[in-house]
Regions:
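Walker A (P-loop) ATP-phosphate-binding motif of ABC ATPase nucleotide-binding domains
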Residues: 2
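Hydrophobic anchor at the beta1->P-loop junction of P-loop NTPases
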Residues: 5
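P-loop (Walker A) phosphate-binding loop of NTP-binding proteins
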Residues: 8
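Conserved substrate/cofactor phosphate-moiety recognition/catalytic segment
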Residues: 11-66
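Conserved nucleotide-binding/hydrolysis micro-motifs of P-loop NTPases
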Residues: 33-35, 77, 102-108, 150-152
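Glycine-rich phosphate-binding loop used to anchor ATP phosphates in small-molecule kinases
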Residues: 50-96
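Conserved phosphate-donor/acceptor-positioning beta-strand/loop module used by diverse small-molecule
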Residues: 92-112, 146
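Small-molecule kinase domains that catalyze NTP-dependent phosphoryl transfer to phosphate-bearing small molecules
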Residues: 115-159, 167-176
Length: 176
């Protein structure tokens, strides 16, 4: 089973992904961590975004083929990246579910983004202006949407877990 999370920086994707990974004993693949490791390695690549996603796809597929549940944690901004995650699941012959994480309270979202700028690691994320001007395309297919505005991290994770359980209950076979 591949659980593909998407959403702008600061909406709570990684917090939810970590909680789900613990709850489901799943592999958590965070594209931001992959991209940071590539930058810190000194390797020169034409597009760090493309390289980070490609590494994520490969690691996800390897783990799915081992029978693990995988949680892909990335901005996942375009139909092309969303399709690529779904293709990973198809190649591994497992189900996949897409979950978009949003924060509908603009002030809360901005506060989250700005609070991360002074914290380690050195690459703690984009500025608010970079977040709001980012190329993030609307979804063109069915997916689950979870709004993290006004709820705690624990509540957001519980909402995500319940949404996945509801989704699974509509499947004929349990996730693998």
């Amino acid at each position: 089973m591949l659980i593909s999370l998407a959403g702008l920086p600061g909406v709570g994707k990684t917090t939810i992904a970590r909680s789900l990974a613990r709850h489901l004993d799943a592999v958590h693949i965070r594209v931001d961590s992959i991209e940071l490791a590539i930058r810190e390695s000194g390797v020169t690549v034409v597009s760090i975004d493309d390289a980070g996603y490609r590494v994520g796809y490969a690691v996800a597929e390897d783990n799915l083929r081992l029978g693990r549940i995988v949680i892909a944690d990335s901005v996942n901004p375009w139909p092309m990246t969303r399709d690529a995650w779904r293709d990973v699941a198809r190649r591994a012959q497992v189900d996949s579910v897409d979950i978009e994480i949003v924060c509908s309270d603009r002030a809360e979202h901005r506060g989250r983004v700005e609070s991360r700028l002074d914290k380690p690691p050195a690459d703690s994320g984009p500025t608010w202006n970079e977040v709001v001007t980012r190329d993030y395309r609307p979804w063109d297919r069915e997916h689950i949407v979870i709004d993290t505005a006004g709820v705690t991290a624990e509540q957001s994770a519980a909402i995500a877990n319940a949404a996945i359980e509801r989704w699974w209950s509509h499947r004929r076979t349990p996730p693998r």
